[in-house]
From Swiss-Prot:
Localization annotation: Secreted
GO cellular component: extracellular region
Transmembrane segments: none
Name under which the protein is recorded: Hellethionin-D
Main location, first listed in the record: secreted
The entry's keywords: Disulfide bond, Plant defense, Secreted, Toxin
Pfam families in alphabetical order: Thionin
Origin: domain of life: Eukaryota
Disulfide cross-links: C3-C40, C4-C32, C12-C30, C16-C26
Length: 46
């Protein structure tokens, strides 16, 4: 599960992934993180 700081970061991440970017690369570029749980931390709610 990916978690982003806000909607802008989420849109960035989705666009990055759509164009073939890897999860780690898109996470770094768009300030998103990946979690193994079903909920996101408060620092990355989106």
């Amino acid at each position: 599960k990916s978690c982003c700081r806000n909607t802008l970061a989420r849109n960035c991440y989705n666009a990055c992934r759509f164009t073939g970017g890897s999860q780690p690369t898109c996470g770094i570029l768009c300030d998103c993180i990946h979690v193994t749980t079903t909920t996101c931390p408060s620092s990355h709610p989106s």
